[in-house]
Amino acid sequence: MLNNKKMSKSTGNFMTLRQCINKFGVEATRIAMADAGDTLDDANFDETVANAAILQLFILEQWIISNCPKEVDFASHKKEEYDTWDNIISNELTRIIGQVNRAYEEMKFKIVIKHAFNELLSLKEAYLIAKAGKPNPFVLFRYLETLLILLNPIIPHFCQF
């Protein structure tokens, strides 16, 4: 299915993998394919998911480039200085890691996208708001490490960048 309609060459509702890659790029296509469904029902490639993935990946890339230094002075921060928000985020990361690992083992890639992509991006925004834009570097490093490791099987080019 394409955009909730049955694919058909005669009606023009048809898109090849090459066309998807040319239109959305490899990473957004892979996210949309993983989100298309992993049950016995017909998979539904939704162009709005691919378009949203392009935007989300671009915003994430720009945020990483502008806000995350390549090296962090961990000596100036102690891991014991976690506040309530740091502990909440650390616990959420641990919970999400478990859910995503189970989803990968069961090959339920839609659930992987839900937790490893959508939920982690929302978690970052909530954390930054709660910390008034001044996150703990240990938590931030763990967040990025978790995000990139969990998404590497689906969007390896982005994660290795």
Predicted regions: what they are:
Residues 160-161:
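Short sequence/structural elements of tandem HEAT/ARM alpha-solenoid repeats
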